[in-house]
């Protein structure tokens, strides 16, 4: 993988809300729905990509890119998945999620 990356750290103060599905910015960025739509460009295409960028335009702390891969960083352990599931690691205090474009 190469290209620009986005690092997102989610602290414990947000995690309980995110795990419950409260629609915080952090939840929206990591939700399975958004990742599926961004990962499968062959199905949704460039027009959908533009719509997603427009929908997220108000989030000034996020550089919006057509992200395809996600890498979890939980201490020294990392795992690459196409779909992010934040419920997989409920005991960690924070997540640094690195998304990299192809």
What are these regions (language model features)?
Residues 1-102:
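Catalytic phosphate/metal-binding cores of nucleic-acid and nucleotide-processing enzymes, i.e., regions
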């Amino acid at each position: 993988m190469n290209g620009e990356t986005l690092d997102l750290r989610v602290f414990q103060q947000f995690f309980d809300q995110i795990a419950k599905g409260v629609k915080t910015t952090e939840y929206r960025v990591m939700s399975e729905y958004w990742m599926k739509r961004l990962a499968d460009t062959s199905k949704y295409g460039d027009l959908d990509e533009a719509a997603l960028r427009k929908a997220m335009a108000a989030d000034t702390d996020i550089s919006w890119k057509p992200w395809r891969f996600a890498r979890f960083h939980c201490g020294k352990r990392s795992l690459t998945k196409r779909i992010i599931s934040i419920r997989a690691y409920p005991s960690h205090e924070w997540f640094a999620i690195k998304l990299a474009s192809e």
